[in-house]
Amino acid sequence: MKNKPLAFQIWVVISGILLAISILLLVLFSNTLRDFFTNETYTTIENEQHVLTEYRLPGSIERRYYSEEATAPTTVRSVQHVLLPENEEASSDKDLSILSSSFIHKVYKLADKQEAKKKRYSADVNGEKVFFVIKKGLSVNGQSAMMLSYALDSYRDDLAYTLFKQLLFIIAVVILLSWIPAIWLAKYLSRPLVSFEKHVKRISEQDWDDPVKVDRKDEIGKLGHTIEEMRQKLVQKDETERTLLQNISHDLKTPVMVIRGYTQSIKDGIFPKGDLENTVDVIECEALKLEKKIKDLLYLTKLDYLAKQKVQHDMFSIVEVTEEVIERLKWARKELSWEIDVEEDILMPGDPEQWNKLLENILENQIRYAETKIEISMKQDDRNIVITIKNDGPHIEDEMLSSLYEPFNKGKKGEFGIGLSIVKRILTLHKASISIENDKTGVTYRIAVPK
């Protein structure tokens, strides 16, 4: 059914609900309806009996008044009446062949026990249920008589059948008419969906300039807002990728141009740095820069892949990793002093190789901007391990603080890089956080790692 039009699906659902409710009501109220029709049968018998005994009482006892007779004094032909003498011995049983003598005998026995003037009864006669009312205390031509009024069960069945036909007709009409609200509801629901479909198709073709307009707050509205959110993120991602591509091209082009320029100079017998050795040193330095940038780009791609995978973290010593990185990098500026405050060995869950890269990127920044010293402290409490790294270099511009983690963000010294972007992604993989703040004497990096 899911391949059918929405209007048809809604109509089928509405019709199914209506039909199920109708069947359920018929099942639940079948006994109630049976009792109702039984009572209705007795009421009809009593009404007809009242009309007959009060206004048109026949003058002949033991005469049956058949409902089929055109001259019958009753108004409802399904009800039949018989005048009987109150004393069974006075009954001649004439003209009653259609009623069994055993039934007439039973009627007299019931009448003998009957204290009320009128009472309801039922019995099986010739395999068919009969509802009857006995009314005593009548007088016909000076003779005591009683009126036996009865109706067959088929009368009750006729009432039930008539009501059932009416219910079926009403249900059929309602189900057919439900097609109208189904079509209206389908159009009401599908109109925004069709619009969303067109927008999504255009977005799939990278035509995402036009916003998705949503003027409702229900589930369809939420879907529209989600599509608009997706469109905005795709636009932002597209712009980021273009900017990233431009920055990568610019960042890689500089060392390549230096290497090519110096290489061509050597071929021409010119040594820009005075001699061959110094000139080759420049080429080697630029090649190392180029290699590092390429490695960082590859590492950033690797982190993007790991972000989508479930990675198992092991316990390792963050103190040992930090000391190893410091030992490797501190020779870049021998004049800097290092102050390390670590109370004890600290174990934490994570990937040692990623933390090595993280600390390397942070400390390279510290070394680049520090004036005289770098301070490192590590502490832990019940919930977090806090790593604080501080340098006494110049403050970071306020407008730069919010964009430090963006790839190829241009630093104060005019350098592009992705070091802090790598730091941020590694911390995200470890559910850790970082804050970079200016203080009175320099810049402080504070990392909080949950245990």
UniProtKB/Swiss-Prot annotation:
Any one GO molecular-function label of the UniProt entry: phosphorelay sensor kinase activity
Keyword Nucleotide-binding: yes
Segments crossing the lipid bilayer: 10-30, 166-186
Domain HAMP: 187-239
Keyword annotations of the record: ATP-binding, Cell membrane, Kinase, Membrane, Nucleotide-binding, Phosphoprotein, Transferase, Transmembrane, Transmembrane helix, Two-component regulatory system
Stretches assigned to the Histidine kinase domain: 247-451
E.C. designation(s): 2.7.13.3
Keyword Kinase attributed: yes
Family annotation (SMART domains): HAMP (SM00304), HATPase_c (SM00387), HisKA (SM00388)
Chain ranges on the Extracellular side, renumbered to this chain: 31-165
Cellular location(s): Cell membrane
Protein name per UniProt: Sensor histidine kinase CssS
